[in-house]
Structures are given as C-alpha cells and as structure tokens.
C-alpha cells in the first residue's frame, strides 16, 4: 500500500506533530470529585511556553505521545486524557510554574500505588521540553482511596496493642547499624527496652548479612523483648526488618516474626518497592503485626527543590500502600526538615481530613474517608535537649527515636534509655500542667536532672551539640 492510499480507519485522521496545548491544555475544565489532581513544579526549556510545558506533562503522563496516531480515533481521548487546567507562576522564581493536572480515575488500576506512580511520574520526568519537573502534591479522591486497605492497623489499634496512652512512644535504632553479632545485637535491644523505651529498631540496611543472619537476629531480639516485658510490665517491640531480595523471602521473614509472637516488623518501602510493601501490609493486617516503614532512598527523590517529588507525595502513597509508622524528619535534628512543611505532611499522615494550606505546602484539600492514620517517626541526630521541642511539635501520636542519643550515653545503654524516658515524662507532665514547652523546655529538662543522674549525665554530654547548616537552594 502506498503512503498516499487511505484506509477506512484513517478517514478523518491527519498525520503529523501538533502542539500539546491544542489537546491537553484546557483552562475551562472543571475538575471532578473523582479526578486525581496533581500539582507539578515545571521549569520549561528556554522558548517553551508554560502552557505547552504543562500540556506536555498532562499528555505524556496520560494518553499522549510525540505524534498524532490514528488509533486515537478508536477511543475517547476526551474521556481518558489528562488535562492541564491551571498554571501559576512560582513567586520569586524565574521561569518556574505550578501546573495543575487532572487525571480521570479510569486511568488507574484499583488498589495499586505502583500503577498510579507509573502513570503520573513514570516517564514524563525525562521529557526534553522540560529543564526540571517536580511533583509537589496529589489529591487522591475518596473513590480511589476506597480501593486501598491502607495501614495494617492505624494509630488507635497500635495504642491498644501497646496499652500506652497519653504520650509519644520512645524508640532507639541499634548502633552500630552493621557489624554486631546477633547475640550482642539482642543484648543492646534488651538493655534499651529494659531502660524504659517502647521500641528498638533494625536500621534500614540490616537485612541478612554474613555477620548476622536474619533468623538469628529475630530469635535474640524476641528473647530481649520477652525478658524486658517480664521485668518492666510494659509491652515492648523491636522493628524486625523483613526487607529482602524477593517478595517471597520478605513474607517468609514476616511469617517467622509472627510465629515468634513479636508485635511489629519493618520494611524499607522505597528500595523494596510499593508492590512488595502493599503485599507485606496485607499480610500484617491479616496476622496482627504492626508495620514500621523506613524511607531509605527518599532524599534521592525528594531533596532537590525543582526536580523529583516532594516527600508529602511519598507520604500519601505510603498511607495508601500501608504502614503503621513512617520516618518523617525531626525539624530539630541532623536531617533536613522545615517545621511548617513537615507538620503539613505529618497531618496528611495522621488526620482524616486536611484542608488546603499553601503555607504548609498542602496544595489540595485531602479527605482520607476514615483510612487509618500513620504515626510519624522523628529520628536523626536528636537527644534529650530536643525532647521539649519534639513533644511540642509532634504531639502524642508520634514515635521519638533516639539512636546515638540513647546508645551514646556515657554510662551505657540502660542509662541512656532511662535518660530519654525521664526527659519525656517530664515534658509530658509539664505540658499537661499548662507549661509552655517552647519557652520553658530547657528549664523543664534541668529540673528533671535534679532527680535523675542518668538524665543529668546525658545533658552534660550533648549540651553543645547542634546541627545547624544553611537551608538548601
């Protein structure tokens, strides 16, 4: 058939390339309650109009490709295409725009974070017409949320399992993160739990290495949990990292944890992947295990201000995929995190309904329609002097996790745990009495030092430790 010969299917079809904005930029579009809405920070290449850049994002993340294809006529593009419906310049930034894109719900497989991200961010970030692209926020409609199980248990169920109310939970990451034998590792777990912590934790890269195979670690940690529970009368846990090279191996480790009767397991959800995470979350709900989530690799995705994906999007995705805890930054420790922005995505993790608030980075009102909440975990370079600020910032429904801030105590692990527990109890009591933790925090800690030599020793060691660096560009 010669190139000039028309077929029946090509009647009305005009081959060639046309501007994306002619099809995918629709400023008159009124969004639907069932649409997934995305806010992209777009930096076009020189000479590319923002309308064309926004339309290109909508096209390449939905039904579009670089040229017109005759099979467009075999479906309804108006029904399935993404639409760039609004564009705002970013104040104070040259040639940056917030482009809002609406996606019809039919584009996405039910209950699949993997498919949602494959569509929205899977291909478009390498598009040549863009110098940079960042997904700032997503609005997940209730109709789509209802296709997900979400967290295995949620905040209230975890409180009931631990029988612990009215205060933040305390944790500790065992250090050194790599190199300990399973028996010595279990010893450190016992000492920290016995000293007053609620949880201890495998670090993100503790899986099953030659110096400590996973089964040995699970056994010694279970022994530490039961021994500390018997001696304190409190329910304890250790985040046993079930992350593995295959989904089958991951589930096998979770099964063994359940057989040991421990309360919680752990997963590295970004390196492990959303499909694996959702599978593990379903197993945990069915078998009564809490699920702690580590966000290892997140800064590769979210740290650049004009390219990648903001952590609030990863946090929303985790709430859909499933996890009872997730690391959220500290605001005050060694890892980056602005207070208002951090509290914005903390609310998105915990609350059932969150109003749009651009000052906190929340681009859309989000209704979670009773999907269980996720407890934020503050971790990274924190110590007893930070306790008042952490208690005031994160409130009761949080885990405050001190690794070096426990194990680095000059008297050893148990006094380190005691110091953190005393500092927390002092801050909670002061708050309940109506004192201002932000203004009186240091005084509250100093008062508690008078009747806790363990806390006094910790305060002396870390009194000058700060992590203050200029904000990133």
From Swiss-Prot:
Say which species the protein is native to: Lavandula lanata (Lavender)
- The protein depicted here goes by the name Ribulose bisphosphate carboxylase large chain
- Care to name a GO molecular-function term for this sequence? ribulose-bisphosphate carboxylase activity
Q: Superkingdom, according to UniProt? A: Eukaryota
The keyword Zinc is assigned to this record: no
The UniProt record lists the keyword Chloroplast: yes
Q: Where in the cell is it found?
A: Plastid, Chloroplast
Q: Which residues carry this modification: N6,N6,N6-trimethyllysine?
A: 14
Q: How is it modified after translation?
A: The disulfide bond which can form in the large chain dimeric partners within the hexadecamer appears to be associated with oxidative stress and protein turnover.
